[in-house]
């Protein structure tokens, strides 16, 4: 009897090792694939809505998701950043001729919403791609919300995928959990945000000690590069995260004027050179990698697919070359993410985005199409393919 118990325990142990061996880990300050025993270059797009496509009962939505992943794989993307537990609440409009608007509700733990993530993770696994899963959209410092966050984490991370039989906390197709997807706080609230992230990390670690944990961080232009790098280092150390995702949105953060998105690029590049160099120095010594998430608007703030994106393409080319340079020099910047992928989404025949479920990288309460990279944006797609394949 004891012998059979020993064999059973051994098999369970081996199974756990198998799951652990497929995880992406930190090794000497680098993202490391324990299966291939090699470093990982982080080449990502934000596609928050991917689980919604997978959960839809409309077969065309699932077909779109499959085709989007095929396109991303062809471009060279290996990570898709998504949002967990999401539901769209439709908001009626006063004008009956208009389609309903929508808002995003998060921390939804009903079983039906696991269906989409189950499907997505299975499709990513088929393509040797990974998911980075945000557990909420934005940071919310309300204590009641924090309690709900903890309940959601417990339920979500212990869910068993109906297609693969693997519990999420053991699933190697998940590269990391991200505390939240967006950062909407001012500099004065940074200490509160740091405490909140620390609490969230502790909550996640109690359930899952295998996956990496990420959190977003936004540079404060009011500080010089060295001061902001020290702030990033302190934030990483105090929260216990494995990797920071630095959000760079030049127009929204005041790096360039909205009236000079092309003319302002040279000055933007000089500023980012200084910040990235400072980040590399500080983060390398702490043996913690970081990535950058970038977004840039279309020329003249167009919102339709295939409209001119020359400024954005120049910015993406700069960022791609900067990431390649840092990786070759074994610096702390390990990769980048594009916010985000709109893929096959299209407005109506008048060029108006009137359908909430025609998902783009923008949330329903944001200007649809402004930052999205669509399949029809051939020149932008070519730039991304060149930069991603270069690595």
Residue positions per predicted region:
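Sec-dependent N-terminal signal peptides
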Residues: 4-14
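Boundary at the C-terminal end of the N-terminal hydrophobic targeting segment
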Residues: 17-22
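Short acidic/histidine-rich active-site segments
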Residues: 291-297
């Amino acid at each position: 009897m004891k012998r059979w118990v020993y064999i059973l325990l051994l098999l369970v142990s081996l199974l756990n090792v198998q799951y652990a061996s497929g995880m992406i880990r930190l090794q000497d300050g680098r993202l490391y694939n324990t299966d291939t025993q090699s470093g990982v270059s982080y080449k990502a797009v934000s596609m928050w809505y991917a689980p919604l496509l997978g959960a839809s009962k409309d077969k065309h939505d699932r077909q779109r998701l499959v085709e989007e992943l095929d396109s991303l794989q062809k471009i060279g993307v290996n990570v898709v950043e998504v949002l967990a537990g999401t539901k769209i609440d439709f908001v009626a409009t006063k004008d009956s001729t208009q389609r309903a608007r929508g808002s995003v509700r998060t921390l939804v733990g009903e079983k039906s919403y696991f269906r989409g993530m189950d499907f997505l993770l299975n499709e990513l696994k088929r393509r040797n791609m990974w998911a980075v899963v945000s557990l909420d959209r934005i940071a919310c410092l309300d204590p009641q919300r924090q309690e709900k966050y903890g309940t959601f984490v417990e339920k979500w991370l212990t869910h068993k995928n109906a297609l693969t039989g693997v519990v999420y906390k053991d699933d190697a197709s998940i590269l990391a959990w991200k505390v939240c997807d967006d950062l909407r706080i001012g500099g004065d609230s940074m200490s509160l945000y740091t405490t909140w992230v620390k609490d969230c990390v502790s909550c996640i670690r109690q359930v899952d000690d295998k996956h990496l944990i990420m959190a977003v961080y936004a540079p404060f232009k009011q500080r010089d590069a060295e001061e902001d790098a020290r702030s990033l280092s302190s934030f990483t150390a105090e929260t216990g995260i494995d990797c920071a995702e630095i959000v760079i949105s030049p127009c929204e953060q005041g790096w360039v004027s909205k009236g000079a998105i092309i003319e302002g690029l040279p000055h933007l590049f000089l500023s980012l050179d200084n910040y990235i160099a400072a980040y590399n120095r500080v983060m390398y010594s702490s043996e913690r990698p970081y990535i950058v998430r970038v977004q840039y608007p279309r020329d003249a703030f167009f919102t339709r697919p295939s409209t001119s994106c020359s400024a954005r393409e120049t910015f993406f080319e700069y960022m791609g070359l900067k990431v390649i340079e840092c990786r070759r020099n074994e610096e702390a910047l390990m990769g980048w993410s594009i916010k985000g992928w709109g893929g096959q989404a299209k407005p109506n025949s008048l060029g108006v985005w009137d359908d909430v479920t025609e998902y783009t990288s923008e949330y329903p309460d944001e200007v649809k199409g402004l930052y999205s990279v669509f399949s029809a944006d051939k020149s932008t797609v070519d730039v991304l393919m060149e930069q991603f394949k270069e690595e």
